[in-house]
Amino acid sequence: MSDQDNTQTSSSKLAPHHNIFMANLESSPTKDRNTSSQNASSSRVIESLHDQIDMLTKTNLQLTTQSQNLLSKLELAQSKESKLLENLNLLKNENENLNSIFERKNKKLKELEKDYSELSNRYNEQKEKMDQLSKLAKNSSAIEQSCSEKLQNMEVNYNSLLESQNLYRDHYSDEISKLNEKIGLLELELSNQNLNYGSDTSSNSDIELNLNKFNDSVKDLKSLETEKDSKLSKIITHSLDELNLQSWLNLYQTNENLISTFAEKMDLKDVLKRNDEKISNKGAVVQTLKKNVQTQVESNNADALSSNNAQDMLPIKMVKLRKTPNTNDSSSNGNSSNNKRRSFYTASPLLSSGSIPKSASPVLPGVKRTASVRKPSSSSSKTNVTHNNDPSTSPTISVPPGVTRTVSSTHKKKRNSMVVHGAQS
């Protein structure tokens, strides 16, 4: 704005001086040069002055043109300055906008840095949790391995119990078959006696009573066997439910120690080698036992069904057959009475002939004889199964005398053979 004021003032100053100068040129004495011939000497001075004036006018014209050019240049510079000022204002506005955008970007950057720090903290926390979970996975794998070993020990004990149960079942089934044979022989004998000699009502009633007692004894044996099976099944299920007990591991270890000591005493080097191989190949034995668990449970159920079917045997009943004696034959009456007394008080000829099996004990028909069965209480059986480390105090069922030793020896043989086969597999 100051430059514009300067240009206006300079133009206003030049305008009147220019007009005066032009008027002086019009009234110049050079026009009267011919008329003023009076003073020739002074005319030269005047001419020289006029020449100087002409030079000055020329220089003045040049200066005016230069001033006009300068004024035009000044106007152009002023217009450029105004444009530059406008551009400067625009650039200032843009700078302010850019500063605001820059501040916003800085705020966003700070927020992103905060988010990054939070995410890094979360990542570190998740990494720590991942490490903890990996440690837990390793511990769980170790626990799983220990549980698999416990399962193996439980399977071995279950196999031993199953074998003992099968041995007892076979033994009692043999005894029942022998008793059934004996009952059939007695029926044949009594039927022959009734057909040949006839029988009195009193002797028939006594024989029926004896047979009823015998049937009761058979029923008692069956009930004891079923009770034994139920207790064994309860013990097995209870032991299978409690797989995480240390007592089964100790029991298995004591059994292995007993086998090794027995083999050392009997100088059985093959058994010792197989036992060592079994201990070294414990993982393979675990896998094979896991495969055999389901088949063993199914065989146990099948054995239970077969035992239930064997219990459906009907009791024996005495058929009353009477032969009318001949009243005329006195000798026949005497013989029949003697035979009645002999058949009631003494052994029958069929029994005295030695046709009875050797395993059956010679007992009178009226005498009731049952196998001695140990009936442990529920609390004692549970403590023996769960908290007793000694295998000798585990709940057992005794067999009749004379058969205990053979059953235990065969059980030991089968158990040793089972250990040997398990080591080989």
UniProtKB/Swiss-Prot annotation:
Write down the membrane topology: Peripheral membrane protein
Provide the residue span(s) of the region labelled Disordered: 24-45, 322-425
Any Pfam family the entry gives: SHE3
Q: What is its main location?
A: endoplasmic reticulum
Q: Which residues form a coiled coil?
A: 68-197
GO CC list: endoplasmic reticulum membrane
Specify whether Endoplasmic reticulum is a keyword of the entry.
Answer: yes
Stretches with biased composition (Polar residues): 35-45, 345-358, 382-397
Disulphide bonds in the chain: none
Would the keyword Cell membrane turn up in this protein's UniProt record? no
Q: Which GO terms describe its biological process?
A: endoplasmic reticulum inheritance; mRNA transport
The UniProt entry, under InterPro entries, shows: She3
Q: Which UniProt keywords apply?
A: Coiled coil, Endoplasmic reticulum, Membrane, mRNA transport, Phosphoprotein, RNA-binding, Transport
Give GO terms: molecular function aspect only: RNA binding
Compositional bias of kind Low complexity: 326-338
* Locations listed in the record: Endoplasmic reticulum membrane
Q: Which residues carry this modification: Phosphoserine?
A: S343, S394
The family this protein is said to belong to: Belongs to the SHE3 family.
What does this chain do? RNA-binding protein that binds specific mRNAs including the ASH1 mRNA, coding for a repressor of the HO endonuclease. Part of the mRNA localization machinery that restricts accumulation of certain proteins to the bud and in the daughter cell. Required for the delivery of cortical endoplasmic reticulum into the emerging bud.
Q: Mind telling me what this protein is named?
A: SWI5-dependent HO expression protein 3
Source organism (scientific name): Saccharomyces cerevisiae (strain RM11-1a) (Baker's yeast)
Question: Coding gene?
Answer: SHE3
